[in-house]
Amino acid sequence: MRISKRLVLLGLLLSLVVRTGHATMRVVQKEISVSRALAGRVLVRGTDEPASGVTVELCSSDWKTVVTSTKTDENGHFSLEQPATGKLFYIRVSAPGMDIYEFRVRIQKHTAPELTIHLSVAT
């Protein structure tokens, strides 16, 4: 019984949706391990087309500082330089007319798989 309650709570945390103006902000808690760089690809939800020109920011744990940022290339790929290991950071993924996604990450020394982020068109 306790396990199922924890799973439900975890599911709620992973699917928290907050309305912000015209865009929806999805806050997803995800801990990943990163070796040399935090890399991934941003796709448009529903079509899986690459999302080019999307801003990907690595923010400090208090959200006050953008540690590093980049934009996706024409194929939706991005790569951020590795910050200090063992620390908690947030990733913010945004583009005009698209929902905003924010992820919590803890940087470790191990290798991580490439992230795939699906952005939805804002409604």
Residue ranges and their predicted role:
Residues 105-112, 118-122:
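Short beta-strand edge segments in extracellular beta-sheet folds
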Residues 62-77:
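Short, acidic Ser/Thr/Gly-rich low-complexity loop/linker segments typical of extracellular
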